[in-house]
């Protein structure tokens, strides 16, 4: 998106500039859907993206369907956010792919899928969002990492998740310092085992002694509340917030 295109969209969306706006990827289910609801409950407008996502009857929620690993989708998301609401205050890079298998079993297609969504999706959309935030001198980016970036588990080999989610954690710290003096905060949350379609309840019996120290798996609401805490903590940047029931601290 060029500067001229951005200015044109801004002029057409002048009425929406007062309301804070969150862009959330992977917004159709699990943590993403919880975040859409959580930000709306706080009065934010939301632009939600997913590969498949239904339009919302709520005028404060706009959905953009598409593969976030593709630059064209990232551009469509930003065009929609600015065109409809005039700004982006917070970007939550929630879309992600997790695939557990032995390292030597990963295929070229697996690699392309995981790195495309986990890294490419972050890269293309965050570039565009920060460009808009720099024009206004404020903004917040939240990345979703994972405990596998800090703690390997032989029962669930996931080198590509560690590679990509660990990269997001490192990029979080780097961007936080790069843009701290320009009004933009960058943080991450690192969820442990959360009850989502990716980790259904019938899989918990196999956890055994891998159950988090708090004695339960996390809920979507636990992650949502952690991200909303970061939203309300203006002095926090470069933070990797572990929402894992003590997994990292306890091992």
Where are these regions (language model features)?
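Short C-terminal tail/terminal secondary-structure segment
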Residues: 2-12, 237-251
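Conserved glycine-rich cofactor-binding loop
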Residues: 28-29
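Conserved NAD(P)H cofactor-binding loop of Rossmann-fold oxidoreductase domains
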Residues: 94-99, 245-246
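Substrate-binding pocket helix/loop in short-chain dehydrogenase/reductase
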Residues: 102-103, 110-112, 207-208
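C-terminal substrate-recognition "lid" of short-chain dehydrogenase/reductases
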Residues: 123, 184, 219-243, 248
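Active-site helix of classical SDR
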Residues: 126, 164, 172
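Alpha-helical segment proximal to the catalytic Tyr-Lys
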Residues: 131, 177-181
């Amino acid at each position: 998106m060029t500067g001229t295109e951005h200015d044109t969209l801004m002029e057409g969306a002048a009425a929406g500039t007062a309301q804070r706006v969150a862009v959330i990827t992977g917004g159709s289910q699990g943590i993403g859907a919880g975040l859409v609801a959580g930000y709306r409950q706080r009065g934010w407008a939301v632009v939600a993206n997913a590969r498949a996502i239904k339009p919302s009857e709520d005028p404060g929620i706009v959905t953009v369907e598409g593969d976030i690993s593709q630059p064209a989708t990232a551009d469509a998301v930003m065009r929609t956010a600015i065109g409809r609401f005039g700004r982006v205050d917070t970007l939550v890079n929630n879309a992600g792919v997790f695939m557990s298998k032995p390292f030597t079993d990963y295929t070229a297609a697996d690699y392309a899928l995981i790195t495309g969504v986990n890294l490419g999706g972050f890269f293309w959309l965050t570039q565009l969002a920060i460009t808009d935030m720099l024009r206004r001198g404020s903004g917040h980016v939240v990345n979703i990492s994972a405990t596998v970036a800090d703690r390997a588990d032989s029962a669930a080999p996931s080198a590509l998740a560690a590679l990509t989610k660990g990269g997001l954690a490192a990029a979080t710290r780097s961007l936080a310092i790069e843009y701290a003096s320009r009004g933009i905060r960058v943080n991450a949350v690192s969820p442990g085992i959360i009850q989502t379609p990716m980790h259904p309840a019938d899989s918990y019996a196999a956890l055994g002694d891998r159950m988090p120290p708090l004695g339960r798996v996390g809920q979507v609401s636990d992650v949502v509340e952690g991200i909303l805490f970061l939203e309300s903590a203006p002095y926090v940047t470069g933070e990797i917030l572990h929402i894992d029931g003590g997994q990292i601290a306890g091992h």
